[in-house]
Amino acid sequence: MGLRAAITLSLSVLFLALSSTAVALPDIVFVTQPPHPDDFATVNATFGSHRASLDAVPRGGDLYIRYSDGTLKNLTAAAGYGKSGFQGAQGIAVRDPAVHWSGIKIIFSMVIGSPTAQYQVETYRWQLYEVIKLGITETPQITKLANQPTSYNNVMPVYGTDERIIFVSDRPQGGQVHTYPQRDEYESTATNSGLWSLHPASGDLIHLDHAPSGDFSPTIDSFGRVIFTRWDHLQRDQQNRCSNQGFGAFNYASEQAGAAALDSDQELYPEQRAQCDGSRSENIENHSFNHFLPWQMNEDGTDMETINHIGRHELASYIPKTFRNDVNIEEFYGQYTRVNQQAVTNFFQIQEDPVIPGSYFGISAPEFGTHASGQIVKMSAPPTKAADQIAVIAITHPDTSGPDATPSVAHIGFSRDPLPLSDGTLIASHAVTSEDDTNIGSSASPASKYNFRLKSFALSGQYYMPATPITTGITKTISYWSPDLLVSYNNVTMWELQAREIRTRALPARLHAILPAPEGAVFQQSGVDVAELRNYLTENNLALIISRNVTRRDNLDHQQPLNLQVEGSTTRTVKNDGKLYSVAHLQIFQGDLIRAYGGLSNTQAGRRVLAQPLHSVSQNPGNRAGPNGSVKIAADGSLAAFVPARRALTYQLTNNAGEGVVRERLWLH
C-alpha cells in the first residue's frame, strides 16, 4: 500500500513537493549529496567512509521521498533540518536510510553542523535519527535515537526483528578510548570497528563483530540472516613492510591503557608479505590478502561466516600458493572447473530481491576511484544452497566493473546502490562515465566527473541498461567553510544515492545458533549441562570452538596442503600422491590493538590490529609442547578450545615444531 493511502492525511502540514519524472514505481526514500570528487576515505568510498569531517563529506544533502506518482518531498527540510545557501551550524549531511518492517518509519544517519567562520575547527559525528509521518501531506518528525554512542560515528543502521538497531560504528573494541580510532590493515587509515547492536530503550549495546578492517551495509534478509560486506585484509602491515621506518610503526606491550610503548615492530602472523622481510623463509611465498566479501550472521552475532560459507575459491580469479617446495601446492588462475564463471574480488551494497528470496544484488567495483560504483551483479544464495553451486551473474556488462580511459561501447557507466523493487523493477544510482573520478574544478569550487542519478534499468539483450532518470534532477546552491576555504556549489545537480523501497515486509523468524547433534551427543555422554555451559561462557565473555577432524579440508584449496595426518596417529586425509604433512597443534591468534604509528616521540592517535598468540584466556588445558596460544589436536583429529568472545580471531595448524602448515586467511570471531 502506498503512503498516500496508508497514512491519515492532514491538510494543515508543511510539505515540499517537487516535479519528478512520473514513472510508476513504488514509494522510495533516498539521499542527496553535493558531488564530491574525492574518493579516499570519504562518504561514498569503499572504506573509511564513516568519518563526518568536512573533507570526508560535504554539507548540504537531504533525505527525500519519491512517491509512486513521481512527487518528491524533502523530508529533512520539511522537518526543519538543513538549508540552502551558507550551511553554518544548520548544515547537514544525510546517509544510509533503512525502512522499518511496518513501512511507517525510517532510520538514517545524519551529521549536523559546519563551521560558522573560517578556520573554525570542530569535531563532528554521524548519529542515528528516525523519521515518522511519511505521508505526502504530513509534516515529518525527526528524533535522535536514544542511547547510541554519542562520541563516535554511527552509520549504516538497519532495524532488527526485535526493535534492536544493528549498525556500523567506530566505537573502539571494548570501549578502549585510548585505541581510537581503529586503523585498517591496508592503509592504516581510520576505519569502523564492525557491527553493533543497540536496544534504544535500555541502552544495551553489543559488539556483534570485531572487524579489524571494517564492516559495511548490513541488511536483514527474508530468512532472518544479517547480510553485510566485510573487508577481509588479514596480512602484515604494509606501512611496516621490511621495517620501513617512514611511518614510524611500533608496538605497545598490550592494548591496555598505560601499556609500555616498545621499540619493536615485530609481527608474528600471517607469513611475510615481501621479499625483503628478514623473517621470511625461502620455501614460503609472500602473502597479501584483500577482499570485500559477503558475510552473514544471526542478529545476536552467532553463526557468523561468509554467506553460505562461500569464499575466494568460488569467487576469486587468482589465488597464490603458500609453499614453493611441493608440486601438489599450486597457484589458482582459473584452471579448475567451477560453477561460478564471473570472478569478483569485491561485493558491495548487497540487497535481496523481494520477488526472489535468496537472490542478492550487489556491486562489483574497484577499491579506489569510482565511489564504490561499478558493475551490478547478483548471486542466488538461499541458506540451503552449497557455496560451490553459487554463480555470480552479470546484470550490467562486465566492462562496467572498472574504469577504462578508452572504453568499449559496452561500458555504459558505473552503478551503485542497486535496489530490486517489489514490482520487479530494478533501480540504481548511475553515473555516465568510464573513468576514475578526480576534481575537475577547484578546491573552492569542486566538480566531479560523476553525475549519480536514480534510474530504472531494463534488459537489453544479455545485459541491463539504464533508462531515463526517475527524477528531473534536484538542484541546490550551497557553501560552507572547509574550514580553511569557502567551498561553493552553485545551482549544482545533486547526487541521488542509497534508494530504499518504503513498504511493509513480513518479519522473518529470529535465528538462533543450534547445537549440532554430534556435539550435543558428546556433551550428553560427558555429563555436561549445555545451559550451564552457555551461562559460564556468557559470564566469562568466552566462546567455545571445536573441530571434528582438522585433516579434512576444502577440495578446491590446492594452494595449501591437502594431505594431512595427525602427528603420532593413524588419522589422516590423503587427496593425492606426494608429501604428507603432520599437524599437532591449533595455534590461535587474537586481534590486539597494539600497532601505532608516528614513532615513540610523535605518536599518532589510533591503533591497528596485530595477530598475537592467544593470551587472554586461562581456561584451556596447558599445551607446553606446542607454540604459544595453542591447543593440542587429539588423535582422531578433533580439538576444542575456549576463546575470547566478540574478539577478532584467526588460527593455523602447526607441526610439532610449531611451524605453520595450514593457515586461516580470514579473521573470525
Regions from the language model: what does each represent?
Residues 1-3:
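N-terminal secretory signal peptides that target proteins for export/translocation
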Residues 93, 101, 107-116, 124-132, ...:
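Catalytic cores of eukaryotic secretory-pathway lumenal/extracellular enzymes that build
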